[in-house]
């Protein structure tokens, strides 16, 4: 069995987009964070070596960095500058509280995806007092310097009803309508089955969405994971393991493996998904037994 034409096209597209998680450590202590703050941190040299090897196997257009908090890495601005000088577009998922923006040489080649979890009081209840102000100021400065900007927002039962108000608030605050991607708080089905990222955190005041709310969110808003899935890619983790997506549970291999071998393992996962898939217009998933804990909500 091979991939359907729809998934085959998407698979070839995602190979041009690499995800790297250099560290799990962070400068904040968010109450609903689900990741363990483990010690391994990829060096700048390790990252560049992996990217160089990757480029020998596939034309690389985009690299996305996430943590932890990558802006705490002393080498991070230099690393991004090296990549943008090579013509690679860089995306950075950040909490927006560590400002080294002046050290980036080509803002137009960088997209900053800043975490804002709702209106100021709610955001600060999770991420710490004063952090909404810091992150929104970071966004304003980034926009003024010429960076591309987006917002990434975790959704719980408490802020679910305020999403439209939140978008209007941001538009008034920033002076433009910014793209917002909503990320439902990791459901119990995710936390129970993920071997590492499984911290429940505080539930009081940050309740998990109900099944109905989850389905409505997937239907009505831009979400991650998207309702059509397809969010797989080669994803290098801080411990040197390589996964088939940023939330992977079973590695495809390790960073010293040949890139072609990693591609082959990813494709095998997608073929396995397609062999049992009943969803229409679905772009596939590299974790067919996991699906980030949202499989029951997909139709």
Predicted segment positions?
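Conserved alpha-helical substructure of the radical SAM core
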Residues: 1-103, 108
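Flexible mid-to-C-terminal extensions adjoining Fe-S/redox cofactors in radical SAM and related proteins
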Residues: 1-16, 241-299
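Residue-level signal for mature regions of secreted extracellular proteins and peptides
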Residues: 19, 23-26, 224, 275-278
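Radical SAM enzyme [4Fe-4S]-AdoMet core and its adjacent flexible, acidic
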Residues: 21, 42, 86-89, 111-117, ...
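Secreted/extracellular small peptides and ectodomain modules produced from precursors
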Residues: 24, 31, 64, 229, ...
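Short loop/turn motifs at secondary-structure junctions
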Residues: 29, 59, 108, 147-148, ...
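Residues that line or immediately flank small-molecule/substrate-binding pockets and catalytic motifs
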Residues: 37, 67, 116, 184, ...
